[in-house]
Design a protein with these regions (language model features):
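Membrane-interface amphipathic helices and adjacent TM-edge segments
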Residues: 203, 221, 337, 412-477, ...
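Hydrophobic alpha-helical transmembrane segments
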Residues: 404-409, 473, 526-539
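Hydrophobic core segments of alpha-helical transmembrane domains in multi-pass membrane proteins
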Residues: 531, 574-583
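Membrane-protein biogenesis/insertion across secretory and organellar systems
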Residues: 1-411, 603-619
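Core hydrophobic alpha-helical membrane-spanning segments
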Residues: 9-23, 477-480, 532-536, 562-563
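Transmembrane helix interruption/hinge and helix-loop junction motifs
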Residues: 395-398, 566-576
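Transmembrane alpha-helical segments that form the functional core of multipass membrane systems
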Residues: 369-440, 446-447, 453-457, 477, ...
Length: 619
């Protein structure tokens, strides 16, 4: 039994050591890089003004789906110039400011309770979008998040819907098409806008763009064929991004191109993988969606599904790096005098769970909830989010909701934990008998193990029962970590005091006396108040049990709280608060059960023993 315990503790020690090294040399540098990116974004962003776009999206040039131009199909993928190439400086990153890029073309304003921006009449692109409800940092005067930008900027990012057809169809709506808006109207939830375009062949396109109160645009195209002959055309849509954005690069979070289409289902493609493969084409599909996702924001297209479509994820590097998620619908025949309607949905905004789920249900969008990276433990993570969110609405604070969730989890697992703690209490009762067995059999480990197992069987004790309280926490711990890390609802959610963002690490550090000393400390020394509280509660919980007699086990026993304090210091504050509160509840629960079982609580004796002089070994 002693040998098993030794191996168990050594395994834990090695695991903790690996996690610590991973945290120091892998996670901490990435967290530091993410903080630096946020700081730079905050410095360069401009606050959004009501009714005015704070950041115009880029109308960038990107190759069209299916390797075709708007006028006709083509075998190769032509490199098209930046739409509106008559604008001085267009296509030359850094020449135009954001304001100049927006002002260089005609636009229709977007004014909703949650969005500000504009639609570029060249290409009818949604390329200027600002999120009114979200800011770059926790500071109330920090800039709003600028989601989309014109393509003439280094960080161009936009969504575009157009058509491709045969030469007989003439010039079809594409990147360079200049649409005509009906009057000087703004796009609001109550006032859709109508754009028109008529080509030389007699095809008239009437586009109606509507937006809801949140993040969903509905683009409805009515195509009237007045050319006198039948034509064939296909609708396409694309989300294009210029430049490679900074990503966290953390394995529990996907940032890059994403979609759910065809038999393949969910496709998650990293920027680096797409740059290597250049193009990824899943099978054709009649439903689904595709786009580009960040940690908290996303832009996605939902084809109508009336015709099958070919999804594609592509990378271009012809002077400027571009990533593109696009689709090309099967061609349809439009008889002379016929009018056909095509509808495409565009999601552009924050990945709010309730909104994403509502769109999936009301619009019938297949697996749209996978736009949020719930991970492999989806069946635990998403329900846990909804529990926390429900408690938040009840209590008004996500920190309190996490504490209440911990109590609920404790209640759910109480029967198992209760049985475990009872077994641990019984183990304490038989300690004298175990000592007798060790003395009786000395170095004969085989007989010692047999005698111990017989004693456990007689007393109905499970020697590994003490592991259950820790093991049952592991899936809950990782599910909560996922919720805190990937859900936007936790972003900038405050607790009390100095914790202004539960999704970020505790900003204080003991090494500068929690901010009293005027200098910053390295990331790996950011040991804040809550990590210290967590470490103390873990230390007290471990001291509830006798110190292992084996020196190796005793050393691990003593150092484990210290190691975990350093390791969890860089984790989200909400997770550390959960762990500290969970330890506190476990101490109370274990103490009550042990007292009822008549087992001695070793906490006080172990604490006193830390300050007691150890006897010198006999000469």
């Amino acid at each position: 039994m002693m040998e098993n315990n030794r191996n168990f503790f050594i395994t834990i020690a090695l695991s903790v050591a690996i996690l610590t090294l991973w945290q120091v040399f892998y996670m901490n540098p990435r967290i530091e890089a993410e903080r630096e990116t946020t700081r730079i974004a905050a410095e360069h962003a401009q606050p959004a003004q009501p009714g005015q776009s704070a950041q115009p999206p880029a109308a960038g040039s990107a190759d069209l789906p299916g390797g075709a131009t708007p006028a006709m199909p083509a075998e190769g993928v032509p490199g098209s110039g930046v739409p509106g190439s008559g604008v001085p400086g267009a296509g030359v990153p850094g020449v135009l400011s954001r304001q100049d890029a927006i002002a260089s073309s005609g636009r229709v304003r977007i004014e909703t309770p949650r969005l500000a921006g504009s639609i570029n009449l060249t290409g009818a692109r949604i390329d200027d979008l600002v999120l009114r409800d979200y800011r770059a940092t926790v500071e109330p005067n920090s800039p709003n998040i600028e989601l989309l930008s014109p393509s003439s900027l280094p960080d161009g990012y936009y969504a575009e819907i157009g058509f491709i057809g045969t030469a007989a169809a003439g010039a079809l709506p594409g990147p360079d098409t200049v649409w005509t808006a009906a009057g000087d109207t703004a796009l609001t939830p109550s006032t859709p806008v109508t754009l028109t375009f008529t080509n030389e062949s007699g095809l008239t396109f009437t586009r109606t763009i509507a937006v809801d109160n949140d993040y969903l645009f509905t683009i409805s195209d009515a195509i009237a064929n007045e050319s006198g002959e039948a034509v064939s055309l296909s609708s396409y849509g694309r989300v294009a991004r210029i430049g490679t954005p900074h990503v966290a690069g953390f394995y529990i979070l996907h940032e890059g191109l994403i979609g759910v289409t065809g038999e393949e289902g969910l496709q998650e493609i990293d920027y680096s993988d797409l740059a290597e493969k250049r193009e990824i084409k899943p099978g054709k599909s009649n439903d689904g969606w595709l786009g580009i996702t960040d940690k908290y924001w996303a832009v996605a297209l939902v084809p109508s599904g009336a015709e099958a479509f070919q999804p594609r994820y592509a990378y271009f590097d012809d002077g400027r790096v571009r990533y593109q998620a696009d689709f090309l619908a099967d061609p349809v025949e439009l008889a002379a005098g016929e009018t056909r309607n095509v509808e495409t949905l565009v999601f552009a905004g924050a990945k709010e769970t309730a909104k994403i789920d509502a769109y999936e249900e009301s619009r019938g969008i297949r697996n749209f909830d996978l736009l949020i990276d719930w991970g492999w433990f989806y069946f635990i993570t998403k329900p846990m989010f909804y529990v926390i969110d429900w408690l938040f609405r009840l209590l008004g604070n996500f920190g309190l909701a996490i504490l209440a969730t911990t109590v609920l989890v404790k209640a759910v697992f109480f029967p198992l934990a209760n049985k475990s703690y009872k077994s641990m209490a019984n183990m304490k009762k038989v300690q004298p008998q175990l000592m007798e067995i060790r003395e009786k059999y000395g170095d004969d480990r085989m007989k010692q193990q047999q005698a111990m197992m017989e004693l456990y069987k007689t007393e109905k004790i499970n020697p590994l029962a003490g592991c259950w309280p820790v093991l049952i926490q592991i899936p809950v711990f990782f599910a909560l970590y996922k919720v805190l890390y990937v859900t936007i609802e936790m972003r900038h959610a405050p607790f009390f005091g100095w914790i202004r963002d539960l999704s970020a690490p505790d900003p204080t550090s003991v090494f500068n006396l929690f901010g009293l000393l005027p200098y910053d400390v390295p990331t790996f020394l950011m040991i804040g108040i809550w990590p210290l509280i967590m470490g103390v509660t873990m230390f007290l919980q471990m001291r509830m049990n006798p110190t292992p007699p084996d020196p190796t086990q005793a050393m691990i026993f003593n150092w484990m709280p210290v190691v975990f304090t350093f390791m969890l210091a860089a984790f989200p504050a909400g997770l550390v608060i959960y762990w500290a509160w969970n330890n506190t509840l476990s101490i109370i629960q274990q103490g009550v059960i042990m007292k009822r079982q008549g087992a001695k609580i070793e906490l006080w004796d172990n604490l006193v023993g830390l300050f007691r002089k150890k006897p010198k070994p006999a000469e």
